[in-house]
């Protein structure tokens, strides 16, 4: 008899068929209490869980006593209670490799769009303001040969460094938990402490997961240490940055501009001051949002669940030591 799994995300037809060839699949719209109550038997019997964005905590796990593996269609997993999963020896699988290049593209897009004020001036053209030769009020700033500071030199940081170094001749500074020999050898990246990176970088790009240690890691003190001409980029996790401190730094001219794909509250509140600032590019968390990459992420998540329920957590497992 095939194991039972709960699917709380839409999948392409071919991936759904692959999942159903291995498991008895119960499809649900979400993980709300109402949904769990309506499908109580399926939740109690499910050995697998697959989806994204929903909160998976100890209370949910109490409703799923047979659960052996959860697979998220994402690289981030801050919506999962990893300790609670590990305590019950439930494997948590994620998709860290398939979105690297696409998220790095998004980061480079934010760098370029913010520096050259591309969205702002495009809207001015559409509004009919382009009536002759443009003056300095249309100008942005150069990207090439400017110093890029990367906070968090993981897979995505390395892919961003490659684009910046080879594509734009940008010197690379980075701060991470340890030295990254590949970044130093391939891109001549220089490891430095965070304060030095903030003081010397023209672009500060934060690519960090959300943990207790990284929550509000970038705040008022850090913005004060940046150049007034600095452009701040965040495409990691919103709460890594104290958003009120960022708003204050932008309003006061402490930093020049910001390009943001993530926020403390998502979707971004309609009354957020960030939405009225011309020196802010705000994207709706599109880091991995291309047709190709989202398909590959879903395929990876399906394969991860199949592997985990077959006892293989050698790849893409957040908590392998807890389940062995």
UniProtKB/Swiss-Prot annotation:
Keywords: Cytoplasm, NAD, NADP, Oxidoreductase. The active site is at 237, 266, 285 (proton donor). One of its GO terms (molecular function) is NAD binding. SUPFAM superfamilies: Formate/glycerate dehydrogenase catalytic domain-like, NAD(P)-binding Rossmann-fold domains. GO terms for cellular component: cytosol; plasma membrane. Homodimer. Belongs to the D-isomer specific 2-hydroxyacid dehydrogenase family. GhrB subfamily. This is Glyoxylate/hydroxypyruvate reductase B.
């Amino acid at each position: 008899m095939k194991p039972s799994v709960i699917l709380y995300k839409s999948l392409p037809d071919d991936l759904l068929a692959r999942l159903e060839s291995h498991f008895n699949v119960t499809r649900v719209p979400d993980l709300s209490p109402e949904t769990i109550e309506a499908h109580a038997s399926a939740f109690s019997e499910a050995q697998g869980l697959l989806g994204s964005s929903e909160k998976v905590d100890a209370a949910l796990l109490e409703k799923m006593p047979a659960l052996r593996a959860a697979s998220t269609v994402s690289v981030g997993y801050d919506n999962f209670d990893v300790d609670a999963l590990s305590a019950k020896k439930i494997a948590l699988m994620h998709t860290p490799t398939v979105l690297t290049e696409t998220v790095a593209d998004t980061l480079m897009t934010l760098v370029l769009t913010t520096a050259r004020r591309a969205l702002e001036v495009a809207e001015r053209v559409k509004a009919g303001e382009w009536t002759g030769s443009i003056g300095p009020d249309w100008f942005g700033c150069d990207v090439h040969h400017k110093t890029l500071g990367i906070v968090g030199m993981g897979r995505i940081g390395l892919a961003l460094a490659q684009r910046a170094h080879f594509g734009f001749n940008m010197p690379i500074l980075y701060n991470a938990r340890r030295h990254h020999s590949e970044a130093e050898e391939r891109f001549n990246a220089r490891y430095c402490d965070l304060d030095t990176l903030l003081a010397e970088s023209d672009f500060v790009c934060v690519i960090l997961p959300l943990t207790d240690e990284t929550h509000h890691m970038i705040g008022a003190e850090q913005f004060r240490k940046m150049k007034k001409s600095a452009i701040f980029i965040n495409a990691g996790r919103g709460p890594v940055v104290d958003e009120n401190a960022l708003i204050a730094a932008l309003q006061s001219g402490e930093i020049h501009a910001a390009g943001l794909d993530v926020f403390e509250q998502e979707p971004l509140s309609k009354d957020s001051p960030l939405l009225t600032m011309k020196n802010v590019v705000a994207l709706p968390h599109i880091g991995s949002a291309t047709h190709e990459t989202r398909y590959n992420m879903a395929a990876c998540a399906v394969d991860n669940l199949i592997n985990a329920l077959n006892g293989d957590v050698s790849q893409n497992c957040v908590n392998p030591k807890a389940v062995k």
